[in-house]
């Protein structure tokens, strides 16, 4: 703690100098020089006490000990009171012994004159009042122990140890943990780099052995648990006859299943892969530049190999090309053409046909793998015809490794919001029944707090400065401030009587205020997915207000002007310093507000229909939005909302979300929470889908949107997402309509 205090003091000085706060810096340095805590250095505190003793400054000694009692000892439990009293008694006796040893009996008389009122009723001091009058107190049986060098050293060591333990157990502010956190992060980064190098060395060795062509099956090193799990195959796409033929072949080649994962990482080691060893992904015939999760690539690869085995000896004889044995150019062209035809036949199956095969042949297969395989096939079928034929260039390596996927299953109805707090340690989730769950993200997923709202809740937001507080917006026009540690409501305020629905809440990064979006009562378009009521301008006309509230006083500061007419605002987001606020409304407009002037700086028509979700880019030079029209659009805020890029997302990524059941049961949910989230560098985006989250890569030029990874794991449509990053590992949160929340931990691979 001592080093942390000194480092923090230096950082504060550097910051004040950088900002030009010279007066504050002068006062800060003066306070440091007069610091009675001595920077929480135990040796300096003990030295100060001994200095008072050696200078016979009784008043200074008594006052400094009283300060330590108020500042430090008062925080201790009552069980430590006797120890503190013994230390104080020993300190005063040390002072008296020093005065007698230095022949200053006048100072001993002064001590008893000033402290007699306090000490005369204490039994341990009755014999000490005679000390100044004894001719040789060091030979007295009662006082001889205190005149020994051993007792003096024992006392100073005991006082030093007591203060050291006290400082170690004393709670410290977060700023003092900066150095220790930095060291932990550096240690984790070093461990990650070591593990990555081991993994690359393993796959390089495997590549070398396979290139040499051993006559016996390879015996690979045991891979980590998460690596072996990532290489599981989604074999549900294959027929039973192909499955049996493929399993017989696998008995002779036990290393093929593991090598699929290792070969995909060869590009990371900057070594050229053998010809034809990297197979195109499922999405390659219909979309250039896309990529899919690793296990899906292996599934397609195994399907192609199985087809070759069933096809006859000609395909079997050509299989060495798959293992990296070079062939003639003509045979490679013919084989590429055949594989392209086989992939087209495989992808010609519709989603329903795949589902029928899965029910008939793989009823006991893993549900996560089945859903991932189905999602991959549907994506391949429904995706646009952007490219024809297989990709000839090498497929880039996967940007993430899936370390684990856990499930939080405390909710029993559809999730509306799922947000990580500013510290990245806790998650707040809200379902349609008004149940709020606060649970830990690091380590074991343990529920910290739980509450049920009598009135329906529509919005949720973490407070920024005091991250223990949660803002909850209801359907009856109130905003509730909930303390997640005390597990109680601190206050509940009414917003607007005629605008009961609190659609969105956004807390300023400064923590001084929050923005609240209130809207009129539920419109038909929010309950019936087939009903749309548009005004003359072709927009959904739902009246609403956008208000700014003070967080401390919980009073309204102002109401923003929404032009041309007051309209319901569905989503809000601040930039990093709270100077800008972006909103998406029911009329399809995006509005950018200057929070210093409290005025609308920019507004533009963004979507046909409502804007569902909006957020700033990583560099805050652009704004991204998802609307009712199914478009994901990037806007340049420096060019009056000029469109930079536009992409069409699947309907299961934008909503409305639909869940069907038995006897014609159908549940429809309109978007409420975040529909997309970025990683720590803003290069990758997480979106919703019918079977799990999907990660896209955002190219810097805005030309393409690459599908990088499908997380899967859900049986119901995902309705909201969030992405929490810590060091190189990030946690993706995907919440679905069946109340399940999946936490997928990813490890980013360095390019």
UniProtKB/Swiss-Prot annotation:
It is a peripheral membrane protein. The keyword Repeat applies. One of its GO terms (biological process) is early endosome to late endosome transport. Residues 238-267 have a biased composition (Polar residues). InterPro entries: ARMC9_CTLH-like_dom, WD40/YVTN_repeat-like_dom_sf, WD40_repeat_dom_sf, WD40_rpt, WDR91. WD repeats lie at residues 410-449, 452-492, 517-559, 564-603, 606-645, 668-706, 713-751. Pfam families: CTLH_Armc9 (PF23138), WD40 (PF00400). One of its GO terms (cellular component) is cytosol. It is found in: Early endosome membrane; Late endosome membrane. Residues 183-205 form a coiled coil. SUPFAM superfamilies: WD40 repeat-like. The keyword Metal-binding does not apply. Keywords: Coiled coil, Endosome, Membrane, Repeat, WD repeat. GO terms for molecular function: phosphatidylinositol 3-kinase inhibitor activity. Residues 356-373 have a biased composition (Basic and acidic residues). Residues 237-398 are annotated as: Disordered. Functions as a negative regulator of the PI3 kinase/PI3K activity associated with endosomal membranes. By modifying the phosphatidylinositol 3-phosphate/PtdInsP3 content of endosomal membranes may regulate endosome fusion, recycling, sorting and early to late endosome transport. Belongs to the WD repeat WDR91 family. This is WD repeat-containing protein 91.
């Amino acid at each position: 703690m001592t080093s942390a205090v000194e480092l923090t003091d230096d950082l504060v000085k550097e910051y004040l100098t950088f900002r030009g706060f010279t007066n504050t810096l002068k006062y800060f340095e003066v306070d440091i020089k007069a610091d009675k805590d001595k920077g929480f250095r135990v040796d300096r505190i003990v030295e100060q006490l001994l200095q008072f003793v050696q200078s016979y400054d009784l008043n200074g000694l008594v006052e400094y000990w009283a300060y330590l009692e108020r500042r430090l000892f008062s925080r201790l439990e009552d069980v430590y009171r006797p120890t503190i009293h013994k230390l104080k008694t020993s300190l005063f006796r040390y002072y008296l012994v020093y005065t007698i040893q230095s022949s200053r009996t006048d100072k001993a008389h002064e001590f008893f004159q000033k402290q007699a009122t306090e000490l005369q009723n204490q039994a341990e001091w009755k014999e000490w009042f005679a000390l100044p009058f004894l001719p040789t107190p060091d030979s007295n049986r009662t006082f001889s122990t205190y005149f020994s060098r051993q007792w003096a050293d024992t006392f100073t060591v005991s006082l030093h140890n007591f203060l050291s333990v006290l400082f170690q157990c004393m709670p410290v502010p977060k700023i003092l943990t900066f150095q220790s956190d930095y060291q932990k992060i550096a240690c984790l980064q070093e461990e990650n780099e070591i593990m990555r190098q081991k993994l690359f060395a393993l796959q390089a060795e495997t590549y070398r052995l396979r290139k040499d062509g051993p006559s016996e099956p390879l015996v690979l090193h045991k891979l980590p648990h998460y690596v072996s799990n990532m290489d599981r195959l989604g074999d549900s796409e294959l027929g039973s006859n192909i499955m049996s033929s493929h399993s017989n072949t696998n008995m002779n080649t036990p290393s093929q299943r593991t090598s699929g994962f290792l070969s995909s990482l060869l590009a990371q080691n900057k070594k050229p892969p053998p010809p034809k060893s990297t197979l195109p992904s499922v999405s390659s015939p219909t979309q250039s530049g896309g990529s899919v999760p690793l296990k899906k690539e292996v599934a397609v690869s195994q399907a192609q190999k199985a087809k070759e085995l069933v096809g006859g000896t000609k395909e079997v004889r050509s299989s060495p090309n798959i293992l990296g044995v070079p062939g003639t150019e003509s045979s490679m062209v013919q084989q590429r053409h055949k594989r392209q035809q086989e992939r087209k036949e495989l992808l010609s199956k519709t989603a329903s046909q795949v589902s029928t095969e899965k029910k008939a042949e793989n009823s006991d297969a893993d549900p996560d793998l089945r859903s991932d395989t189905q999602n991959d096939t549907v994506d391949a079928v429904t995706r646009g015809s952007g490219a024809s034929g297989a990709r000839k260039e090498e497929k880039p390596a996967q940007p993430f490794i899936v370390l684990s996927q856990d499930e939080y299953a405390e909710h029993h109805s559809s999730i509306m919001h799922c947000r990580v707090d500013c510290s990245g340690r806790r998650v707040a989730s809200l379902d349609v029944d008004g149940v709020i769950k606060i649970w830990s993200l690091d380590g074991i997923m343990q529920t910290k707090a739980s509450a049920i709202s009598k009135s329906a809740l529509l919005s949720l937001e973490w407070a920024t400065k005091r991250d223990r507080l949660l803002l909850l917006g209801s359907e009856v026009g109130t905003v509730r401030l909930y303390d997640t540690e005390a597990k109680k409501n601190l206050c509940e305020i009414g917003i607007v009587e005629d605008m009961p629905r609190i659609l969105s809440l956004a807390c300023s990064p400064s923590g001084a205020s929050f923005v609240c979006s209130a809207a009129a009562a539920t419109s038909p378009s929010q309950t019936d997915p087939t009903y749309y009521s548009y005004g003359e301008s072709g927009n959904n006309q739902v009246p609403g207000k956008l208000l700014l509230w003070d967080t401390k006083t919980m009073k309204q500061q102002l109401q923003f002007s929404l032009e041309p007419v007051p309209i319901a605002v569905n989503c809000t987001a601040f930039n990093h310093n709270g100077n800008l606020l972006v909103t998406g409304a029911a009329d399809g407009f995006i509005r950018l507000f200057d929070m210093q002037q409290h005025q609308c700086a920019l507004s533009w028509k963004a979507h046909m229909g409502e804007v569902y979700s909006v957020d700033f880019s990583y560099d805050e030079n652009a704004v991204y939005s998802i609307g009712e029209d199914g478009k994901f659009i990037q806007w340049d805020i420096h060019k009056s909302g000029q469109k930079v890029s536009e992409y069409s997302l699947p309907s299961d990524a934008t909503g409305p979300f639909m869940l069907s059941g038995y006897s014609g049961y159908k549940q429809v949910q309109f978007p409420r929470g975040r529909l997309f989230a970025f990683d720590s560098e803003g290069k990758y985006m997480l979106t919703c889908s019918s079977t799990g989250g999907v990660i896209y890569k955002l190219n810097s030029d805005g030309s393409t949107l690459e599908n990088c990874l499908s997380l899967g794991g859900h049986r119901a449509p995902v309705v909201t997402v969030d992405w929490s990053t810590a060091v190189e590992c990030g946690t993706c949160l995907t919440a679905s309509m069946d109340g399940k929340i999946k936490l997928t931990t990813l490890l980013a691979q360095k390019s």
